Amino acid sequence: MQWAVGRRWLWVALFLAAVAVLTQIVWLWLGTQNFVFQREEIAQLARQYAGLDHELAFSKLIVELRRLHPVHVLPDEELQWVFVNAGGWMGAMCLLHASLSEYVLLFGTALGSPRHSGRYWAEISDTIISGTFHQWREGTTKSEVFYPGETVVHGPGEATAVEWGPNTWMVEYGRGVIPSTLGFALADTVFSTQDFLTLFYTLRVYARALQLELTTYLFGQDP
């Protein structure tokens, strides 16, 4: 009996050690990456259009991103607004760029929505174009409110409660192990809403973004 208990603890210790080693490898890998975008670059671009009608702001932002990074933003025919169900909330996203280590997307909701933020092996920042963003950080007893032009940063491994007012739209930039975020992003779609068409749209646009980055890496770079 004692031997069985000891074996269980041994497996737990080995599992935790493997997780620690994997985490270290992941962060070392991220340190070797040449990122296309910078968090502050995306935030500054979004601030230029904060307060405008969100559709006008998004169209201007896309034009500017294509000017700055012409081979790293999906073409118009690949842009699509896709529902996202995660953490008990529902929003919509339009993916502009994605790789294994970063992404840029447009995100928001036409209806107010409280939710759990999720925990990620990635840093995620949202610069607000319109509406309000309430954030309640883990370990605190008060929430913060963010308005158009402000940027909300969600660090790796952090968890918060968030709530958006109606017609809240933002520009989001993520950097880290991007495939690790898909579990949270798709869990409700698979196990709750069972909206498999949305699941297909999400995976398809991510695959196309990866294909664009691979093609750019192999055959061409930013001028």
UniProtKB/Swiss-Prot annotation:
Additional notes on this entry: Sigma receptors are classified into two subtypes (Sigma-1 and Sigma-2) based on their different pharmacological profile.
Q: What family is reported?
A: Belongs to the ERG2 family.
- Cytoplasmic side residue ranges read 31-223
The protein's name:
Sigma non-opioid intracellular receptor 1
InterPro entries from the xrefs?
ERG2_sigma1_rcpt-like
Report disulfide bridges, numbered on this chain.
Answer: none
Give the span(s) annotated as Targeting to endoplasmic reticulum-associated lipid droplets: 2-8
| Cited function | Functions in lipid transport from the endoplasmic reticulum and is involved in a wide array of cellular functions probably through regulation of the biogenesis of lipid microdomains at the plasma membrane. Involved in the regulation of different receptors it plays a role in BDNF signaling and EGF signaling. Also regulates ion channels like the potassium channel and could modulate neurotransmitter release. Plays a role in calcium signaling through modulation together with ANK2 of the ITP3R-dependent calcium efflux at the endoplasmic reticulum.
Bilayer topology: Single-pass membrane protein
Report quaternary structure and partners: Homotrimer. Forms a ternary complex with ANK2 and ITPR3. The complex is disrupted by agonists. Interacts with KCNA4. Interacts with KCNA2; cocaine consumption leads to increased interaction. Interacts with RNF112 in an oxidative stress-regulated manner.
List the record's Gene Ontology CC terms alphabetically. anchoring junction; cytoplasmic vesicle; endoplasmic reticulum membrane; growth cone; lipid droplet; membrane; nuclear inner membrane; nuclear outer membrane
Q: What is the effect of changing residue 99 to A?
A: Alters pentazocine and NE-100-binding. No effect on pentazocine-binding and same effect on NE-100-binding
**Pfam families in the record:** ERG2_Sigma1R
Name the source organism.
Answer: Cavia porcellus
Give positions of region: C-terminal hydrophobic region: 177-223
Q: What is its main location?
A: nucleus
